[in-house]
Structure formats: structure tokens, C-alpha cells
């Protein structure tokens, strides 16, 4: 299928202050956005794609100055792809607090003339949705044909259908959960502890010291990657294969250097992540994950929390995803059915664990393609 080709981000500036769930206020902030396809005259074919932890506004296509900069969901979004940009106008937004151009910890705090660092206020999924709604307003979009996301992006899609029910026709929530389990919060805490205990963290003001807490970021990313893959997938990819620096494949080195393929993979992913991601942003986003719990205000009753939704839903999960297991998606499905909402649900038998939502699986893509065909017929796209 054809790639969407060369794309370019745009920066949108917002002068109206944004009051956060914590009570803090962000004023004069900016959000980086990318769009693909054309908005129709009725402004009825817009789809918002919400990103997960380490992703960004760059959903699809490549940048002219970097042919390797393929968007994180390029296999899903583009001409002739499941989310077909010949029919839909697709928006990707880099969330507030991120490190890819939107206002966040790396931005200059106008009150001090220095980067916010750890002083940047804690943000929530709900804060992101309110900020994204202002992006929609700027484009003149009153109602999205769909809001879609996987993992943390799926939480944002679900939050959209709760917070702006009249502005979402379809909610597409993939490999997600209505709230984090204690185990998931624990994984996030271990990752944050690795960053906070790095001597280069400097209380979050490492920018002034010209350093980055890379050791902590590496460990945080390694922990994350373990949870994104299934046991079977790791066994197939790595098994107990050795990878020694001296090239030997059949003997132990009796040291603590890298010896196993899986060790090499985790260190590579950790190093790569630490080079491009910001530690303060990692802390913020994992805390936003922890806090997401729309049923909390309803004494834990998810059915009550979803009572005022109006959208139609596609909920999808993956059989080997143990980070956000299929049972968590089924909780959402049950609550929606209890409210007599229109719900399509699929549990896809895929070996790749949580990361399966990012991969080009024919059954998964055919599901999304068919669902978007239905949406296209509804909006005349």
C-alpha cells in the first residue's frame, strides 16, 4: 500500500489558560500537531488518533530531512490503509507535558526564564482531552467521526466519549483498560524509582547541569519492554541464545557483561530510548496512567461512569497481552452493554503481547478496515 509520504508538523498556540485537574493552570501553551488527508466540507470525516506513552503527534509518513522517521502507526494510517487518508482527515496531537515540541518540562517557564523541569504540573488523561478539544475547536470540528487509540491512547479515546459525548461518533479503544491494576502501578513505580535515584536527575533540574539521567531512563525502558512482549514472543525471538562480544556462541563468559540475546535487546532499547526521551516527561506520563480511573467518581462502578456516553464503540484486545489483558477490555464492554450501547468487541489471537496493537497483523487490520468502512458510509467519506 502507498505511504502517505512526506509530512510536516505544525505548532498551535493557545493563549487561553488551561486549568488542570490538579488545580494548576497552564497559560500560553503550545501543542504540536500533524494532519493527514483532507477535511471535507461538512467537517464530518475527522478522526483523532491519540498516542501512547513514548509516541507523539507523528502518526504516519516521514519527514523530508529524515527518511527513517516513519510515523509510529504508519501501517495503520495512510492511503488505502485501515484508516484511509483518502477518505478521512486524521489528526495526531503531541500531548501536553510531552517532549516532542508541545509545552512540557523542557519548555521555558515564563516566570523563571528556565525550563520547568520538575516544576511542570502533573497532568492527567482528562487534561489531555480538554487540550485536544481546543485543537478540534481550532479546526472547526464539532464532532469527530472517531477518536482512536491504543494502550494509553485508548484511555484517551474512552475519556473523550465520557467527557465530550456529543463530540464523538465512534470510540475505538485498543489494547487498553478502564484503570491500571496494582501490578501496573507497581511497574510504573519501579520505572520512576530508577529515574529518581539516578545521580544525574538532580531533582528534575538536570537541564541546568548539562546532563540527562540516562541510566534511570534505560532501566525504565527495559522494564517497560518486558511488559510489552509476551512470554512466548520473547521465547521465540530470543530464547536462551547467547550473544557475546567476542562472538562466541556456545560458552558462558562467567561475567556480568551481556551474554544473552535478550539482554542485548533490552540494553539496545534502553540506550535508544534514553537518547531521545525526557525523564521528567516519563514521570508525568506514567503518573497520568496511574491516575486514570473514570469509575472512581462513581464508587468504582464503571457502568455508572459510562451511563452518559453516546458513541458507538469498537473495543479490541490481544490474547497474549498481559499488561492490559483482554479481561480488562471486557470490563469496558460489559459496562457499555449494561448501558445498552452499541459495542463491537474482538479479542485477537496474536503472539506479540501488548505491542501487538502497533503491528501489521492481517486479522487486526481487516477488523479496523471494516469498521472504518462503516464509519465512512455514515459520514459520506
Swiss-Prot record:
GO BP, sorted A to Z: homoserine metabolic process; methionine biosynthetic process
GO cellular component, one term: cytoplasm
Residues covered by the AB hydrolase-1 domain: 45-360
Binding residue positions for substrate: 221, 355
Membrane-spanning ranges: none
Pfam families associated with the record: Abhydrolase_1
The entry's keywords: Acyltransferase, Amino-acid biosynthesis, Cytoplasm, Methionine biosynthesis, Transferase
Location in the cell: Cytoplasm
EC number: 2.3.1.46
Site keyed Important for acyl-CoA specificity: positions: 323
Pathway listed: Amino-acid biosynthesis; L-methionine biosynthesis via de novo pathway; O-succinyl-L-homoserine from L-homoserine: step 1/1
Active site: 151, 321, 354
InterPro entries: AB_hydrolase_1, AB_hydrolase_fold, HAT_MetX-like
Signal peptide: none
Catalysed transformations (reactions): L-homoserine + succinyl-CoA = O-succinyl-L-homoserine + CoA
Domain of life (superkingdom): Bacteria
GO MF annotation: an example: homoserine O-succinyltransferase activity
Summary of subunit composition and partner proteins: Homodimer.
Function statement: Transfers a succinyl group from succinyl-CoA to L-homoserine, forming succinyl-L-homoserine.
Family the entry assigns: Belongs to the AB hydrolase superfamily. MetX family.
UniProt protein name: Homoserine O-succinyltransferase
Gene from which the chain derives: metXS
Amino acid at each position: 500500500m502507498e505511504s502517505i509520504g512526506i509530512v510536516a508538523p505544525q505548532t498551535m498556540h493557545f493563549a487561553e489558560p488551561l486549568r488542570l485537574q490538579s488545580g494548576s493552570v497552564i497559560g500560553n501553551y503550545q501543542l504540536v500537531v500533524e494532519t493527514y488527508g483532507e477535511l471535507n466540507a461538512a467537517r464530518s470525516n475527522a478522526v483523532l488518533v491519540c498516542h501512547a506513552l513514548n509516541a507523539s503527534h507523528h502518526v504516519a509518513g516521514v519527514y523530508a530531512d529524515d527518511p527513517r522517521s516513519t510515523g509510529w502507526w504508519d501501517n495503520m494510517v495512510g492511503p488505502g490503509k485501515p484508516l484511509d487518508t483518502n477518505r478521512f482527515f486524521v489528526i495526531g496531537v503531541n500531548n501536553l507535558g510531552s517532549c516532542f515540541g508541545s509545552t512540557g518540562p523542557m519548555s521555558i517557564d515564563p516566570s523563571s526564564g528556565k525550563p520547568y523541569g520538575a516544576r511542570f504540573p502533573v497532568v492527567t488523561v482528562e487534561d489531555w482531552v480538554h487540550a485536544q478539544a481546543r485543537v478540534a475547536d481550532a479546526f472547526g470540528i464539532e464532532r469527530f467521526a472517531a477518536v482512536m487509540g491504543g494502550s494509553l491512547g485508548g484511555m484517551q479515546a474512552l475519556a473523550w466519549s465520557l467527557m465530550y459525548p456529543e463530540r464523538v461518533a465512534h470510540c475505538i479503544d485498543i489494547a487498553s483498560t478502564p484503570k491500571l491494576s496494582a501490578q501496573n502501578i507497581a511497574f510504573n513505580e519501579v520505572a520512576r524509582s530508577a529515574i529518581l535515584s539516578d545521580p544525574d536527575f538532580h531533582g528534575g533540574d538536570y537541564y541546568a547541569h548539562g546532563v540527562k539521567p540516562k541510566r534511570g531512563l534505560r532501566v525504565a525502558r527495559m522494564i517497560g519492554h518486558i511488559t510489552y512482549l509476551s512470554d512466548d514472543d520473547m521465547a521465540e525471538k530470543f530464547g536462551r541464545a547467547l550473544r557475546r562480544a567476542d562472538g562466541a556462541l556456545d560458552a558462558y563468559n562467567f561475567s556480568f557483561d551481556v551474554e544473552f540475546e535478550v539482554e542485548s535487546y533490552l540494553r539496545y532499547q534502553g540506550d535508544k530510548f534514553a537518547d531521545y526521551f525526557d525523564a521528567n516527561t516519563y514521570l508525568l506520563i506514567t503518573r497520568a496512567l496511574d491516575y486514570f480511573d473514570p469509575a472512581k467518581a462513581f464508587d468504582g462502578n464503571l457502568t455508572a461512569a459510562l451511563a452518559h456516553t453516546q458513541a458507538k464503540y469498537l473495543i479490541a484486545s490481544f490474547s497474549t497481552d498481559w499488561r492490559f489483558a483482554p479481561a480488562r477490555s471486557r470490563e469496558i464492554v460489559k459496562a457499555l452493554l449494561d448501558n445498552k450501547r452499541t459495542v463491537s468487541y474482538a479479542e485477537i489471537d496474536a503472539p506479540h503481547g501488548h505491542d501487538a496493537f502497533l503491528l501489521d497483523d492481517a486479522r487486526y487490520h481487516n477488523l479496523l478496515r471494516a469498521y472504518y468502512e462503516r464509519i465512512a458510509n455514515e459520514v459520506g467519506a
